[in-house]
């Protein structure tokens, strides 16, 4: 083999090595893009399912409220009452497994989780303390779907004696 042929083969070999490196880099980029695409599609799918679940669960909240009203009116120990209670607990359990949580009413009123439906003037407890839950509130994966309707304590208004202002300078 001549010197010229060796140079040509060496040059061709170098070009092929360069081409191989380019193709290898291209393949790595494609693989990374594909992985990112798969992750994005999976995230979008999870988000779509979550939004669909949120929509359905928000439509079921009035049903939960109706169950609670029925249970508050029923007589404990009655077979019908116990059956309704069992169905309510099963429904609530299924919804909780999907991400629904009842808003637990703490001691203080929180305008992001509570809706004040009544203000009760009292000095017995600290101001803005939740006194009673009128209707339960719910969250879905941390997002408030329905605020809890509550009665809130407020300080009594001071009834000031009516002041009769007498004009100091009467013009006649």
UniProtKB/Swiss-Prot annotation:
This is Protein GrpE. Homodimer. PANTHER family: GRPE PROTEIN, GRPE PROTEIN HOMOLOG, MITOCHONDRIAL. It comes from the Bacteria. GO terms for cellular component: cytoplasm. Keywords: Chaperone, Cytoplasm, Stress response. The gene is grpE. Its main location: cytoplasm. Gene3D superfamilies: 3.90.20.20, Head domain of nucleotide exchange factor GrpE. It comes from Thermotoga sp. (strain RQ2).
């Amino acid at each position: 083999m001549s010197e010229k042929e060796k140079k040509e083969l060496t040059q061709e070999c170098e070009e092929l090595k360069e081409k191989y490196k380019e193709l290898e880099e291209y393949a790595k980029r494609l693989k990374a893009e594909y992985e990112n695409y798969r992750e994005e599609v999976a995230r979008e799918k999870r988000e779509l399912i979550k939004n669909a679940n949120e929509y359905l669960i928000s439509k079921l909240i009035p049903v939960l409220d109706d169950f609670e009203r029925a249970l508050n009116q029923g007589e404990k120990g009655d077979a019908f009452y116990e059956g309704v209670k069992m169905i309510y607990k099963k429904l609530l359990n299924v919804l909780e497994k999907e991400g629904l949580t009842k808003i637990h009413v703490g001691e203080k009123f929180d305008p992001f989780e509570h809706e004040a439906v009544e203000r009760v003037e009292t000095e017995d407890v600290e101001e803005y303390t939740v006194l009673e839950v009128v209707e339960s509130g719910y969250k879905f994966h941390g997002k408030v779907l329905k605020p809890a309707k509550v009665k809130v304590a407020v300080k009594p208004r001071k009834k000031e004696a009516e002041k009769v202002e007498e004009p100091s300078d009467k013009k006649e």
